[in-house]
């Protein structure tokens, strides 16, 4: 049975097969975990992201989708970049956005599985500058990881 472990720390120091990056749609780096992954991983990650933008993602990566690059100098094989939604505040729209957040986790975990990753480090997607409450983002991540693990073919 797969193991889920909560780690509070620097995701760039994790020794895993895949690190999920809470990216922005431009894929060109930014603040928070996105900037930390680009800095720690080195210029090859940005070069691959630029290539993706020039070839297959000219309009950027849509919310809830995921794409993989190499991991550069990180202790991983891949970086799985995903874009989460911006927190709209409590209310009906939050429920719809929560589905987008689930989608970001689901597509990231699915892509990591297709790549052959046996271990994946997930950040609290959307919890930084996108304003999502960290405890809710973590709960969505955990629930989605458990659902994904239980789904056939994952």
Q: What kind of feature is each model-predicted range?
A:
Residues 1-98, 102-114:
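Glycine-/small-residue-enriched capping loops at alpha/beta junctions
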Residues 86-154:
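Phosphate/ribose-phosphate-bearing ligand recognition and processing surfaces
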């Amino acid at each position: 049975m797969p193991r889920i472990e909560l780690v509070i720390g620097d995701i760039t120091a994790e020794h895993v097969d895949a690190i999920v990056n809470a990216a922005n749609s431009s894929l060109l780096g930014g603040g928070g975990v996105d900037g930390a992954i680009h800095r720690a991983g080195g210029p090859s990650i940005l070069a691959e992201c630029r290539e993706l933008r020039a070839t297959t993602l000219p309009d950027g990566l849509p919310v809830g989708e995921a794409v993989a690059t190499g991991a550069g100098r990180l202790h991983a094989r891949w970086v799985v970049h995903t874009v989460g939604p911006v927190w709209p505040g409590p209310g009906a729209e939050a429920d719809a956005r929560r589905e987008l957040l689930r989608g970001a986790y689901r597509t990231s975990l699915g892509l990591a599985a297709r790549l052959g990753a046996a271990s994946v480090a997930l950040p609290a997607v959307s919890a930084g500058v996108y304003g999502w409450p960290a405890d809710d983002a973590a709960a969505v991540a955990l629930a989605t990881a458990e659902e994904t693990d239980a789904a056939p073919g994952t």
